[in-house]
Amino acid sequence: MKKYQRYLELDRSQQQNFLYPLIFREYIYGLAPSHDLNRNRYILSENVDYDKNSSLLIVKRLITRIYQQNHLILFDNDSSKNQFWGYNKNLYSQIISEGFAIVMEIPFSRQLSSSLEEAGIVKSFNNLESIHSIFSFFEDKFTYLKFFSDVRIPYPIHLEILVQTXXXXXXXXPLLHLLRLFLYEYCNWTSLITQKKIIFTFSKSNPRFFLFLYNFYVCEHESIFLFLRKKSSHLRLNSFSVFFERIYFYTKLEHLVEVFSKNFSSTLSFFKDPLIHYVRYQGKSIFASKNAPFLMNKWKYYFIYFWQCYFDIWSQPRMIQINELFENSFHFFWGGYLSNVRLNFSVVRSQMLEDSFLIEIVMKKLDTIVPIIPLIRSLAKAKFCNRLGHPISKPVWTDSSDFDIIDRYLRICRNLSHYYNGSSKKSLYRIKYIIRLSCIKTLARKHKRTLRAFLKRLDSEELLEEFFTEEEEILSLIFPRSSATLRRLYRSRIWYLDILFSNDTINVN
């Protein structure tokens, strides 16, 4: 993205009016939807193989060529199975859509950087990009909250809404014509409902273009929500100060203090902490609050009316469930991490003086559990164990050397430790046991010996030591301290904020 920005270092007031006409000029109007598009689909004489990294110059040349010939490029052998997008990566339309997404990302990336500078989180933005940052948010916030709701962000019911929403952000008519063309040629515009199958195919065939449209839609969705939240916070401060003045007023009148404590305490508790905590992961969002369940209901209807009025999305109130966190465990799927989050209560007893009474303090602790059953199912699919979780050998790896076999299993254990280190250790040890025993059975199968004979012939403790010392070696590189500190860190839970992608632990065969 940086290599494109250096050509476009313009004043922001001139950027929207200058950017797209400069790159594409008037040729985009030649791509406007018309009846000729469906009639003039014939094949070019040659198949030009472009590089996957398309540039703005290639996109401009392609648009010029399409404008001059007034047709879309489809190849003969793919014409029966391809629509406008197709599955052939050499299609000109594929390159144009990718270049379109690149051009559109430039102004929005600048808006993101400016918003991060205003919020003062530029330095910690890399940590926020991690897929594990949501767990640190849970540990910091959810132990103090009581009600939560897991909401799926709905897709727009009609893709024309995306075009109209984009028109408010970028006032460029050629750009809107091009965007409308892509959406028009991909799906049937006579249908008012975008089906899940169409969206799934769209996201697979043009991931960058789809991610741009989806991120733009979510950005528009969250900007209005944050505006409402900010206004609600402002009202909270004003109301809070008013009630404090009433406290001071009634405190001066001694005979009204008791009346105030009976009649106004419940009202004051509502204004104690009405803030809504919001976090988004994948296509879902979570909003939670400390108390006042009717405040959560108010925000639920905010979402419903907002979707109806702004995006024409009809949603039923029963689709948004408000749960109490202290009674129900919280299940969610994020970045390939199927997790079960629950709150455990621990009692801490303290004694200030020898003759004083004991004080019991109940503390809430967030517990993240490794999903054992889905992991065992994945290990069984990769032939490391059977469906019951009993380790088996890996026959396809017996042709490799002993060092390569051990290294492959160590890599799996390392990925598991790195990815699930912030969760329960007990569940993680059970998964590692399957991998370690599968490694020993694979080596015994290679040397054509039984498991018992192989363990007698080979020093099993030396073999398994590499598995146990691997995590300590990793921690020693991160925390170069005493061995006691390393042992404490080995037993503790650590979330690594350098993980930006989903786990690929099992797909190593």
Curated annotation (Swiss-Prot):
One Pfam short name: Intron_maturas2
Localization in the cell: Plastid, Chloroplast
GO molecular function terms noted in the UniProt entry: RNA binding
GO cellular component: chloroplast
Keywords tagged on the record: Chloroplast, mRNA processing, Plastid, RNA-binding, tRNA processing
Superkingdom of the source species: Eukaryota
InterPro entries: Domain_X, Maturase_MatK, Maturase_MatK_N
UniProt record, GO biological process: mRNA processing; RNA splicing; tRNA processing
Family indicated by similarity: Belongs to the intron maturase 2 family. MatK subfamily.
Task performed by this protein: Usually encoded in the trnK tRNA gene intron. Probably assists in splicing its own and other chloroplast group II introns.
Protein name in UniProt: Maturase K
Protein's organism: Stylosanthes hamata (Caribbean stylo)
Lineage: Eukaryota, Viridiplantae, Streptophyta, Embryophyta, Tracheophyta
Gene expressing this chain: matK
